[in-house]
Amino acid sequence: MKKFALPVVAIALLVSGCYGVATARFYPVHGPLTQQAPAPVLVGTLTETFNSGSIKLVLENGEVCKGHWSPVPRPSRTESGTTSKGTAEDMSAVWDEIYGSGFYVARVLGSRRYAAATAVGSHGTKVYVEIYEPESEAHETDASRIRGVAKDSNGNIYKITFQNRFVI
């Protein structure tokens, strides 16, 4: 019986989409990196979709930033306000700068598929990352539907895109 447990668990994880690795591209939209021609596109990896996992990002100077991310708690019915209390940084303005005024409150805040991380670099740079997936698309396996934003301690703001499928 035990020899069948591992394949069954692996298949269940694959079918449910609860485990995977995605490559993320960080496009600078504001800050010092946008002054470079062409602006560098940073590449990172995120693991284990929206349950919790790790993030790794290599900055333009070669600095490696690593961190752990987890779901952002949904606000309780008694809480009021326009930002989540579960994040290290208030990223609502970053969402609105990239996706348009009111996007954060209308789409991201309170979403079931909303996660945040702080990645710390080997030279001390901090990168605050948030990702969100529209609930109407939450059961698909194509990572391109996920939206994300980031800002770093050097004054850069990034739009994050995912262009591949989550895989084991």
Labelled PLM ranges:
Residues 28, 59, 83, 121-123, ...:
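Acidic surface patches and DE-rich sequence motifs
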Residues 45-53, 72-85, 134-146, 167-168:
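Short, surface-exposed linear segments at secondary-structure transitions and domain or protein termini
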Residues 14-34:
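Bacterial Sec signal peptide processing site at the extreme N-terminus
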Residues 1-18:
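Sec-dependent bacterial lipoprotein signal peptides
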